[in-house]
Regions:
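Positively charged n-region of N-terminal signal peptides that target proteins for export
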Residues: 1-4
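Domain-length accessory/inserted modules outside core catalytic folds
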Residues: 94, 105, 113, 157-160
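N-terminal secretory signal peptides
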Residues: 21-81
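Hydrophobic membrane-insertion alpha-helices, especially the h-region
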Residues: 6-17
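Mid-chain, structured segments of secreted extracytoplasmic proteins
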Residues: 65-105
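C-terminal partner/receptor-binding element of secreted or periplasmic proteins
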Residues: 123-160
């Protein structure tokens, strides 16, 4: 009986190991291969910095992709009439989508983001670790304000 039990448990463990397990949608799985940034038109070559915005117009919904968090902030600011259902960012260290309410941003010009802003979206645990290490960490609103200042310091204020 003991031998049969061990054999049965071995089979159960092997089956459990072999069965597919659910996983979070990886960012690279969710960004279409031909996606271009809705703001600057660049292809989304590095999904670690990608962002997306789900917008609606009546009954229709669309997903806008961005190559850099800064482009999403710019698009948000320059298109105030959009009905935004969700803003999501690829968060580090393991790229996956997270809603804007659940992310923070590391601000560091040395981070090589596609548009050079140096904004890296991270989850709460990573934000706490980075803040404790002395790095600059901003909320969604703080990162949006940083991007606005970053753009205006380089290109001037937009004309009304």
């Amino acid at each position: 009986m003991n031998r049969a039990f061990v054999l049965l448990m071995s089979v159960v463990v092997l089956l459990a190991w072999a069965l597919p397990r659910p996983r979070e949608a990886a960012v690279t799985d969710a960004v279409p291969a031909d996606a271009e940034c809705a703001e600057c038109g660049m292809s989304i070559a590095d999904a670690r910095f990608a962002a997306r915005m789900i917008v609606s117009n009546g009954d229709a919904e669309a997903t806008l992709y961005f190559d850099d968090a800064g482009c999403l902030f710019d698009h948000d600011r320059w298109h105030p009439g959009l009905v935004v259902r969700s803003r999501e960012f690829a968060v580090s260290p393991k790229p996956r989508w997270a809603r804007s309410e659940a992310v923070a941003f590391i601000v560091d010009p040395k981070i090589g983001t596609p548009m050079g802003t140096g904004l890296l979206a991270v989850d709460a645990a990573e934000a706490a670790r980075r803040r404790a290490a002395g790095e600059r960490v901003e909320s969604f609103e703080g990162a949006a304000a940083y991007r606005k200042h970053w753009m205006e310091s380089r290109f001037g204020k937009p004309k009304p």
